[in-house]
Structures are given as structure tokens and as C-alpha cells.
Amino acid sequence: MVAIKNLVLVALTAVTALAMPSPLEERAATWTCMNEQKNPKTNKYENKRLLYNQNNAESNAHHAPLSDGKTGSSYPHWFTNGYDGDGKILKGRTPIKWGNSDCDRPPKHSKNGDGKNDHYLLEFPTFPDGHQYNFDSKKPKEDPGPARVIYTYPNKVFCGIVAHTRENQGDLKLCSH
């Protein structure tokens, strides 16, 4: 009888432990970028909503070389964010505010981009399906698509995702998340 009571007590304890809520896993942010793309059937531009997973974009950034334009494709390269190399805002430009002090500070970008005290933003292609961009592709280089993951040099801190407003040309605008 004692054995049965102990067995019931162990079973109830196990059920209670399994029924306790576990912490929820934080989901990766989804970034939404708007981009005009030409419809091949109508030959007219249409607004497309492109979705990017932040974990994939961060992975793209971490797999990219830590260089400024020194690859076959020229990616990654400096994202000026409206600044010159000395951290002064260029006339008529408004820098994107990322909400992260590493990303928001004015850059220091030496002539070759790898000075001892350099800190600036890099841009690297990112894709909705998360595949890695072939940064060593030469002419014809792989299509980088409309979106870029932005991160810091030299620490590779993720800042955000920006996209061209029309296909792979024009201004880069901050995507929403």
C-alpha cells in the first residue's frame, strides 16, 4: 500500500512539473520593406512588401568579411548614413536613428576604412529566404537584391535592415519591424 501511495505521489509530482509554464522563446523580429518592382507581364512597377527575418540578416552580417569594399563584389561596404568620414552630417542629409548607441554615433572612417580608431556602419545584402550573398563574386556579380543588413565596424553589432525604394536603385530607407 505504501508503494502505491509513493507511486501516486511521484506521478502527481511529475504531472505538476510538466504542467508548469516554461518561458517563451523570443521570436526573431520580422522586418518589412517596401520596394517597387516591375511586373514582367504588365511592364509596370508595383509595390511589393518584402519580409526579412532578423536572425537571418544577423547571420548574413556575421558571415560577411570585416572589410570595406575589398571583395570581388565590393560588399560589404561603408554605409555613410548621411555622414562624411569625420562624422559630420552631409548637407541635406538626415541620418537614420537606429535606437542603439553603437549604431547611432557619428562615424570615424579613415581613407582605407581600416584605421586603428575607425568605427562606422557597413551594409551587406540580405534576402527574404536568408541565403548568404556570394561576396567574392566578380563581374557579373551576384544580384544583391534591394535590401541590406546594416551593422557596425569593427564589432558587427546589428543595427537594422534598409531597402532601396525601387528595385536595386535609389535611396535606402529603414524597413519597419
From Swiss-Prot:
Signal peptide per UniProt: 1-27
Gene3D superfamilies, sorted: Microbial ribonucleases
One annotated Gene Ontology cellular component of this protein: extracellular region
Pfam families named in the record: Ribonuclease
Region of interest (Disordered), residue spans: 98-117
Residues that span the membrane, as ranges: none
Role, per record: Clavin has the same substrate specificity as alpha-sarcin. It is specific for purines in both single- and double-stranded RNA. Its toxic action on eukaryotic cells is the result of cleavage of a single phosphodiester bond in the 60S subunit of ribosomes.
Stated name of the protein: Ribonuclease clavin
Species this chain originates from: Aspergillus clavatus
